[in-house]
């Protein structure tokens, strides 16, 4: 499993060579001194092997190993978050990021398991199933708070340590503006979302500030992604195929850009998501487009479609028109969400610029 991590799994976490080197060489080195990181590495590598196995029993076994290792990691990892220092910051940052990857992948697995319990052709599943689907989605949102916690408390230690290439993004543009005509059109779509609350009697509600902030951060995330898919502007890297406009596949220079939003939204906004606030869930559905457009990354497979499907079930048929565009982009037919899925999780033949490892 460790061999698989070093030569295969580690290369799927980053798009640039310095960061790949950190995952491939520095993380195993850090793991020598931190058992929790060893278990995180074994967990995610097992999960990756489970993804690659065709045999269902082997797949189930590897996923069980992954869960066991992650549970062991968390028992020793969590207590150390209260004392982040020079000796453990890099290992904690690596562990928290691997935990996020674990949560992304297991959320997709758990939702697939739930889908198998839903009769073919169901339009809206029972409320209990919808709650479980939303719980899976929110797990991924919370997942990225782990790396954020480490960075906020131990930034100087991380930025000066072995994980510096993973944490630092000095070359990102400081001014986030839509970089193409298509990006400007999508920004207009995002801008229009605030009419759901600003043009109603909810405009003065306390929660409005959190909705506005989350939407503003999402507009910046879309703009950043549009800037990082421009050709020949930013550092040349082993980048990831990204469906820029749902038909043309560009190259996203750094997929880390799609995760920024989850680290910026407030806890109050996350609480709105947990209480199934319609307007917050619409914003989340538009966010789902970003991971939904990434191609050929095993731990992001299906995530965009899962987000939109769960959100659609939570907000009800009467509100489906509000998420029609995100559903179309990620390939989800809302009226046939539990039939044969039509989304292009693995990309079309001409999109396979990078093998699915």
Language-model regions: role of each:
Residues 1-82, 311, 348-357:
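Amphipathic alpha-helical dimerization/protein-protein interaction segment
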Residues 4, 72, 94, 98-102, ...:
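Alpha-helical scaffold segments in carbohydrate-active enzymes
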Residues 21, 25-32, 57-64, 82, ...:
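Short, solvent-exposed segments of well-ordered alpha helices
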Residues 29, 132-357:
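C-terminal effector modules of eukaryotic transcription factors
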Residues 36-37, 87-95, 281:
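Alpha-helical scaffolds flanking conserved acidic
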Residues 44-48, 95-109:
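Short glycine-rich beta-strand segments
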Residues 61-78, 104-158:
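Structured all-alpha helical bundle cores of eukaryotic regulatory proteins
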């Amino acid at each position: 499993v460790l061999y698989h991590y070093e030569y295969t799994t580690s290369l799927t976490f980053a798009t640039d060579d310095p960061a790949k080197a950190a995952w491939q060489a520095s993380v195993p080195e850090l793991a020598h001194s931190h058992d929790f990181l060893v278990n995180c590495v074994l967990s995610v590598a097992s999960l990756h092997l489970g993804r690659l196995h065709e045999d269902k029993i082997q797949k189930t076994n590897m996923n069980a190993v992954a869960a066991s290792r992650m549970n062991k990691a968390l028992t020793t990892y969590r207590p150390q978050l209260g004392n982040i220092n020079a000796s453990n910051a890099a290992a904690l940052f690596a562990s928290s990021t691997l935990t996020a990857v674990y949560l992304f992948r297991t959320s997709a697995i758990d939702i697939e398991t739930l889908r198998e319990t839903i009769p073919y052709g169901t339009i809206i599943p029972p409320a209990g199933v919808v709650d479980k689907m939303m719980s899976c989605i929110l797990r991924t949102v919370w997942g990225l708070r782990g790396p954020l916690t480490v960075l906020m408390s131990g930034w100087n230690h991380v930025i000066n340590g072995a994980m510096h290439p993973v944490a630092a993004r000095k070359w990102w543009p400081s001014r986030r503006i839509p970089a193409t005509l298509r990006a400007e059109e999508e920004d207009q779509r995002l801008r229009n979302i605030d009419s759901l609350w600003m043009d109603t009697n909810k405009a003065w509600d306390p929660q409005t500030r959190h909705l506005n902030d989350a939407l503003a951060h999402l507009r910046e995330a879309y703009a950043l992604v549009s800037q990082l898919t421009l050709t020949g502007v930013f550092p040349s890297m082993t980048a990831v195929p990204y469906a820029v406009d749902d038909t043309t596949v560009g190259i996203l220079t750094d997929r880390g850009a799609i995760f920024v939003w989850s680290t910026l939204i407030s806890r109050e906004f996350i609480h709105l998501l947990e209480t199934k606030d319609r307007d917050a869930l619409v914003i989340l559905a538009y966010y789902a487009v970003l991971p939904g457009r990434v191609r050929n990354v095993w731990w992001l497979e299906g995530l965009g479609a899962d987000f939109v499907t769960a959100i659609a079930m939570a907000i009800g048929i009467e509100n489906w028109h509000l998420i029609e565009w995100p559903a179309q982009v990620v390939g989800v037919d809302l009226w046939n969400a539990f039939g044969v899925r039509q989304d292009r999780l693995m990309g079309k033949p001409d999109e396979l610029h990078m093998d699915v490892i």
